[in-house]
C-alpha cells in the first residue's frame, strides 16, 4: 500500500528510534547506528544473526524521516560552499517524545536546547544546515532569501574552556 513502509524487524526500528533520540544533535552515520547497536549488545534478542545491513538501517531511518518523527540536517562546507555527504545530525520533532522514550535527564541538556533552536529556525522559515570550516563546526547556518545567520548554541558560557571552544 502506498505510504506504508515494510518494517520487518520492529525491535530494530525501536532500537534505532532510541539511538537517534539519545543522540540528537550528534554527528551520526548510518553505519555507526548499526555498529553501535551491535557493539553495545542492544540487539541481543537471541534471534539476530549478525549486524543489520546498512540498507535496512537506512530504510528504517528514511521511514522515520518521512513520518516527521526525526529531521535530518546536512553538513555544509562553508569554505567549499557545498553540502557534504557525511555525518549529518538528527533532531526529534518533539523533545517530549524524547523524554518519554528515554526518561527525563539533564546530562545532555545542551543537545536538547540545540534541538529546540533547530525547530524554531525551521518555524521561522529558515533553511538550516550545519556549518563546517576545517575541523571547526558552526551549530547552524540559517538562510532565508538574502539573509544568512551563523548560530552557536551552548548551555552556558561561564567556563573559559566553553567560551574558547564556542567562539573559535
Residue ranges and their predicted role:
Residues 1-148, 155:
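Accessory nucleic acid-recognition modules appended to NTPase machines
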Residues 131, 155-168:
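Catalytic cores of nucleic-acid endonucleases
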Amino acid at each position: 500500500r502506498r505510504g506504508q513502509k515494510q518494517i520487518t524487524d520492529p525491535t530494530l526500528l525501536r532500537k534505532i528510534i532510541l539511538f537517534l533520540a539519545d543522540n540528537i544533535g550528534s554527528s551520526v552515520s548510518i553505519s555507526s547506528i548499526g555498529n553501535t547497536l551491535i557493539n553495545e549488545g542492544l540487539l541481543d534478542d537471541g534471534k539476530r544473526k549478525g549486524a543489520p545491513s546498512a540498507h535496512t538501517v537506512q530504510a528504517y531511518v528514511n521511514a522515520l524521516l518521512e513520518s516527521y518523527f526525526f529531521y535530518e540536517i546536512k553538513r555544509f562546507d562553508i569554505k567549499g560552499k557545498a553540502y557534504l555527504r557525511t555525518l549529518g545530525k538528527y533532531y526529534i520533532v518533539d523533545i517530549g517524545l524524547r523524554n518519554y522514550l528515554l526518561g527525563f535527564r539533564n546530562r545532555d541538556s545542551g543537545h536538547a536546547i540545540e534541538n529546540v533552536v533547530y525547530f524554531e529556525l525551521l518555524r521561522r522559515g529558515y533553511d538550516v544546515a550545519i556549518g563546517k570550516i576545517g575541523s571547526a563546526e558552526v551549530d547552524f547556518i540559517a538562510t532565508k532569501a538574502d539573509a544568512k545567520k551563523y548560530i552557536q548554541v551552548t548551555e552556558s558560557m561561564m567556563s573559559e574552556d566553553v567560551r574558547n571552544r564556542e567562539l573559535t
